[in-house]
């Protein structure tokens, strides 16, 4: 805020200030984590000087990591493509798109806490051969994700004008958001809550190969083509967000099917039974 608008005695740098602030926050966060790792007693067992490379244990981590890297790359790549399509529609469209996207992330990132909990608990229960407990816990978290998403959706609808005013004073941008985009974001919050929880549950079960292929098909095979059509066929911003909805619907259907098929319960054993890393 200070670097963008020049408050608190700081220079007014605009977009450059936002970049500096974001980079500074990342550096501070990294320094804090490194400090905890190297100097905290609770991390003494994990010091670098005590590490030993085990190829037997490294191979499953490499497989899981590559699956998730491809999955995340497909998701981020499709989102970048959609943003580029919005940018080609004009500055107002791009602004409205980014505001809507940040609102979607606000709800999703909060709900992601449930996904991380599910990831850890699924890994724990499957590692101790408690498949039924893992499945029951997963169903509970799915319901929690849906309720949390519903709360965010209602909040977005109820405070739509106030929320939009916090982001912009532009009449054009407000009209674009009020033409159905905010409604679209709000309606998909319960769906997003379920999808994010399912994502965490399946990562905890090391079912990453399925997640990779589902995202490749959904992101590159569904979302990207719809975004392209929105740009070239005159569908506008609502066309891009129809693509977002199609992607999330695809993820909901495929991940629900995978979870309730229960084939994921064997994936962790096949990958060595090692607990997966926290989601990013």
Language model features with spans:
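Hydrophobic positions within alpha-helical transmembrane segments of bacterial inner-membrane proteins
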Residues: 1, 18, 76-77, 149-157, ...
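Helix-terminus/linker motif at the lipid-water interface of multi-pass membrane proteins
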Residues: 1-13, 73-106, 124, 164-171, ...
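Alpha-helical transmembrane segments of multipass membrane proteins
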Residues: 1-5, 34, 80-85, 106, ...
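Short alpha-helical transmembrane segments in multi-pass integral membrane proteins
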Residues: 10-66, 122-188, 229-280
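Transmembrane helical elements of multi-pass membrane transporters/channels
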Residues: 25-29, 33, 37, 55-117, ...
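Small-residue-rich hydrophobic transmembrane alpha-helices
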Residues: 96-160, 193-214
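Small-residue-enriched core segments of transmembrane alpha-helices in multipass membrane transport
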Residues: 102-103, 216-225
């Amino acid at each position: 805020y200070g670097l963008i608008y020049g408050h608190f005695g700081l220079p007014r740098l605009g977009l450059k200030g936002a970049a500096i602030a974001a980079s500074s926050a990342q550096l501070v966060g990294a320094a804090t984590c490194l400090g905890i790792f190297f100097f905290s007693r609770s991390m003494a067992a994990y010091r670098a000087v005590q590490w030993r490379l085990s190829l037997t244990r490294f191979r499953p981590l490499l497989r899981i990591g590559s699956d998730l890297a491809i999955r995340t790359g497909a998701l981020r790549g499709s989102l970048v493509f959609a943003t580029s399509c919005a940018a080609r529609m004009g500055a107002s469209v791009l602004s409205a798109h980014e505001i809507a996207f940040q609102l979607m992330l606000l709800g999703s990132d909060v709900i992601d806490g449930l996904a991380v909990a599910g990831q850890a608990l699924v890994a724990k229960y499957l590692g101790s051969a408690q498949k039924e407990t893992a499945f029951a816990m997963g169903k509970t978290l799915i319901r929690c994700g849906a309720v949390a998403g519903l709360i965010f959706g209602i909040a977005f609808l109820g405070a739509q004008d106030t929320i939009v005013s916090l982001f912009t004073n532009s009449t054009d941008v407000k009209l674009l958001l009020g033409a159905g985009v905010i409604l679209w974001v709000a309606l998909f919050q319960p769906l997003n809550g379920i999808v994010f929880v399912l994502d965490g549950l399946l990562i905890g079960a090391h079912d990453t190969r399925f997640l990779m292929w589902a995202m490749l098909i959904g992101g590159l095979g569904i979302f990207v083509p719809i975004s392209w059509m929105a740009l070239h066929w005159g569908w506008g911003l609502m066309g891009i967000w129809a693509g977002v909805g199609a992607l999330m619907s695809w993820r909901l259907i495929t991940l629900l099917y995978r979870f309730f098929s229960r084939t994921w319960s064997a994936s962790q054993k096949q990958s060595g039974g090692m607990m997966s890393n926290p989601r990013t």
